[in-house]
């Protein structure tokens, strides 16, 4: 998407006009204009010069934005609130002339305030003074007239057109009255003079401009606050870096740093670009990027990101990503792109904004004609028409959605939750089913030692020492868990392994002095050592908890079991509970076998588990789930891309510095599952805010325009002075923007106010295991089986056993050589044995 800066827009009608003009350019596939940031996002093959010309032909200005990181500062300058100081200056100057004008025009009539003697009784002079003050105020606020009439001539009237027409009509009619009064004065017709004196609308013309300026200033200040998050991100970009050239440290501009350059960072300095530490260690404060305030320890080989703060050590790093490729630049681009897109809910407001101003002008003209036809004076009819013009506000409609999107997106970015588009921010909260990938999402993705069970006579330290000596020569992921546990226990044993042998998928063996040691699964160890029944039961207990039991033996004697598991993240159960409290069905996807999957699922508290799903099979599962309701898929983005893309909403968790995950609609920079319900809360709060804004914008115009037209005058005697209409218009947009700013106070991690949406989704037809029901089992038997070699063997034995009447479930493991059979009715050992052996496997024992 190419980004453009657009100038000259003042209201929603302007942005609608620009969007329509650019969308009609050949080669443009999509165009989205943001009145809030005065920016435009364009997709397609059209040349930028053609796009800029289309904008200029529509009566506005445009220029293409730069994309380099060094432009972050200039982009921040583009977002700087330059409008408020200008409007403030105009307002103060206008008030200097408006106050005496109001004193002269209304003070003596309404409150009997004294007027200067030179003007007392001199009605023509009084009119001329009002004419002078009003003319000065109109010159001060000439922007309304230049923009308004220019847009009118381009056949694209906007809010400024309404203001300009209303003020100009008041001014023109008052000038006519002044001439008529002068003529009456010359003919000594004092009754006519007094009548004309009360028909001046100079104060209305001036007050309309001043009040609209007040509203514009309040709106500009509020709009400036909505982009604070984006501006603060842009200002984080470091301006310089210290690089090493010819063994000397040289400070250079950030744009001069290239990939592969070596740079240094001292304590208290920010990392200039993304890189890898090649020397030194430190703790980095990454709160600017992830929202996590606790410093993260970094050592040689670890990645560092631009804009993070080096709190302690001296670091020497190699630049890996510079310019627009840094994490910070990608975040800025993502927030900017989201601001440039439009949520589906904005389409109604956009359609209304496109025809709003012409419709209002027609209503104003019709109002005047109707009042003249029913016999009212021209002055009365004109006042009603002017009131219609100045009370109508297309800006409130146009700002209702983008201000909420900008604030919501900024809030998310502060907490490491990145919504790529306005659509993703709106739609995430509508999720009915959440599919969670197990590894890296519910669990940490890093196996850890959870239990150590030494046999009698062996200490935990002795067991861990032998396991450490054996496993340190292995490359298996489970071996790393044992090595980490040994390091934590400060075991630095000098036991040396000789004749090391690794049997793929089974275990390890080697010699320590004259003793042979073994480590591996139950089936492997049984070949070399007798395993007591108590230890077999313990291993089954551990397996039922979702853990992998590793057996260790020394010279035909079992010395113990070490259980390893990919442990559940600390916040996962609470996050799942929060999702369920929101009325969302939570499904876990995993490639694990049923027993392990169900154990993890129970710990996490999910509604359903789908086990045995390979990475390539996740996409088809998501397709099935989508038939039941709106699905969000949460994964780490590494092997989940097809599933993330297939889901209604793809959420990549734990992205860290790699936020450019194309398949994801929402990117969570931290690995906390609790950020998923937080993202849904923020989405729901933003959508609610948009609904409030749209309601206010529509109801304001629906009530205000008939009131201004005098619809209630004949019945209740209500009529609206144009000045009060202008005051209402000036406050309408301010109210909308201020309401959106309330999102800054929203606590997205607070679950106390969660509302449970009505969810009629039923998942029974999908091949899932419902783990929330208490399973009633009258008997359980464990069969030891030889001959099973793979998953197909497991499936064959499982299918055979579960075909028996009375067998409710059979959990089969070829690695452990066991089948745990759950029965609701008694099934004899002979029947179980015969059933398995008919499949060419051997049953050695049943317990």
Language-model segment annotations:
Residues 1-127, 223, 248-249, 333-341, ...:
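Flexible metal-binding regulatory segments at protein termini and peripheral loops
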Residues 16, 29, 267, 431, ...:
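Conserved ATP-binding TGD loop and adjacent catalytic N/P-domain core of P-type ATPases
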Residues 25-49, 53, 199-200, 231-325, ...:
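Conserved cytosolic catalytic loops of P-type ATPases
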Residues 86-240, 351, 452, 717-722, ...:
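Transmembrane helix-loop-helix hairpins at the membrane interface
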Residues 87-89, 308, 432-436, 442-475, ...:
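ATP-driven catalytic headpiece of P-type ATPases
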Residues 110-124, 153, 172, 411, ...:
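Membrane-embedded alpha-helical bundles of multi-pass transporters
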Residues 181, 190-192, 206-267, 298, ...:
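Juxtamembrane coupling segments of multi-pass membrane pumps/enzymes
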Residues 289, 348, 383, 396-470, ...:
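Conserved catalytic phosphorylation-site environment of P-type ATPases
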């Amino acid at each position: 998407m190419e980004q453009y800066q657009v100038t000259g827009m003042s209201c929603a009608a302007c942005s609608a006009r620009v969007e329509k003009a650019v969308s009609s350019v050949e080669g443009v596939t999509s165009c989205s204009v943001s009145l809030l940031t005065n920016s435009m996002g364009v997709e397609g093959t059209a040349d930028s010069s053609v796009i800029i010309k289309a904008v200029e032909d529509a009566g506005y200005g445009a220029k293409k934005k730069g994309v380099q990181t060094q432009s972050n500062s200039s982009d921040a300058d583009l977002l700087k609130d330059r409008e408020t100081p200008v409007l403030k200056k105009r307002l103060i100057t206008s008030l200097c002339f408006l106050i005496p004008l109001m004193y002269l025009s209304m003070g003596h009539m309404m409150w009997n305030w004294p007027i200067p003697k030179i003007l007392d009784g001199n009605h023509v002079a009084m009119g001329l003074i009002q004419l002078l003050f009003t003319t000065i105020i109109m010159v001060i606020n000439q922007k309304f007239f230049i923009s308004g009439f220019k847009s009118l001539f381009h056949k694209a009237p906007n809010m400024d057109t309404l203001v300009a027409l209303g003020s100009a009509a008041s001014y023109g009619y008052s000038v006519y009255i002044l001439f008529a009064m002068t003529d009456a004065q010359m003919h000594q017709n004092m009754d006519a003079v007094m009548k004309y004196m009360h028909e001046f609308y100079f104060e209305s013309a001036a007050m309309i401009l001043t009040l609209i300026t007040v509203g514009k200033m309040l709106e500009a200040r509020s709009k400036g606050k909505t982009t604070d998050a984006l501006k603060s991100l842009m200002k984080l970009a470091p301006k310089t870096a210290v690089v090493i050239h010819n063994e000397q440290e040289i400070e250079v501009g950030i744009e001069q740093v290239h990939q592969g350059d070596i740079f240094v960072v001292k304590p208290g300095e920010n990392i200039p670009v993304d890189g890898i530490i090649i020397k030194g260690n430190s703790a980095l404060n990454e709160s600017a990027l992830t929202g996590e305030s606790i410093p993260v320890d970094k050592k040689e080989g670890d990645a560092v990101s631009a804009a993070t703060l080096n709190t302690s050590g001296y670091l020497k790093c190699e630049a890996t990503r510079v310019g627009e490729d840094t994490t910070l630049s990608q975040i800025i681009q993502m927030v900017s792109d989201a601001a440039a897109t439009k949520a589906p809910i904005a389409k109604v407001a956009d359609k209304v904004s496109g025809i709003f101003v012409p419709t209002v002008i027609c209503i104003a003209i019709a109002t005047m004609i109707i009042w003249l036809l029913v016999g009212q004076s021209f002055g009365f009819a004109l006042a009603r028409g002017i009131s219609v013009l100045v009370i109508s506000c297309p800006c409130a409609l146009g700002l209702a959605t983008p201000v909420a999107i900008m604030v919501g997106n900024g809030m998310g970015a502060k907490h490491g939750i990145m919504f790529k588009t306005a659509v993703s921010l709106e739609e995430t909260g509508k999720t009915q089913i959440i599919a969670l990938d197990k590894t890296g999402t519910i669990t940490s993705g890093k196996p850890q030692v959870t239990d150590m069970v030494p046999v009698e006579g062996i200490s935990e330290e002795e067991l861990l020492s032998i396991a450490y000596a054996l496993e340190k020569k292995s490359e298996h992921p489970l071996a790393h868990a044992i090595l980490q546990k040994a390091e934590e226990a400060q075991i630095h044993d000098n036991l040396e392994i000789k004749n090391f042998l690794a049997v793929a998928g089974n275990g390890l063996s080697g010699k320590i002095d004259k003793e042979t040691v073994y480590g591996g699964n139950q089936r492997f160890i049984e070949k070399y050592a007798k395993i007591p029944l108590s230890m077999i039961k313990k291993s089954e207990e551990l397996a039922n908890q979702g853990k992998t039991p590793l057996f260790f033996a020394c010279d035909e004697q079992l010395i113990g079991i070490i259980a390893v598991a990919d442990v559940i993240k600390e916040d996962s159960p609470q996050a799942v509970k929060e999702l369920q409290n929101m009325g969302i069905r939570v499904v876990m996807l995993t490639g694990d076998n049923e027993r392990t999957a169900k154990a993890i699922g129970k710990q996490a508290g999910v509604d359903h588990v789908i086990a045995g799903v390979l990475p390539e099979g996740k996409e088809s599962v998501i397709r099935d789930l989508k038939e039941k309701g709106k699905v969000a898929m949460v994964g780490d983005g590494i092997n989940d891309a097809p599933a993330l893309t297939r889901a209604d909403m793809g959420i990549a968790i734990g992205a860290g510095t790699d936020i450019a995950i194309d398949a994801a609609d929402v990117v969570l920079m931290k690995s906390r599952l609790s950020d998923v319900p937080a993202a849904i809360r923020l989405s729901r709060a933003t959508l609610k805010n948009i609904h409030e804004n749209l309601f206010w914008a529509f109801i304001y115009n629906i009530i205000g325009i008939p009131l201004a037209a005098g619809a209630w005058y004949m019945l209740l005697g209500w009529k609206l002075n144009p000045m009060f209409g202008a005051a209402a218009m000036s406050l309408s947009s301010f109210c909308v923007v201020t309401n959106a700013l309330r999102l800054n106070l929203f606590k997205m991690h607070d679950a106390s106010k969660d509302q449970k949406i009505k969810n009629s989704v039923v998942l029974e037809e999908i091949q899932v295991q419902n783990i929330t029901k208490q399973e009633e089992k009258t008997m359980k038997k464990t069969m030891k089986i030889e001959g099973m070699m793979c998953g197909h063997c497991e499936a064959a034995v499982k299918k055979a056993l579960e075909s028996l009447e009375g067998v409710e479930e059979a959990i089969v493991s070829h690695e452990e050589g066991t089948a745990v059979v759950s029965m609701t009715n008694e099934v004899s050992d002979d029947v179980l044995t015969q059933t398995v052996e008919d499949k060419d496997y051997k049953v050695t024992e049943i317990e």
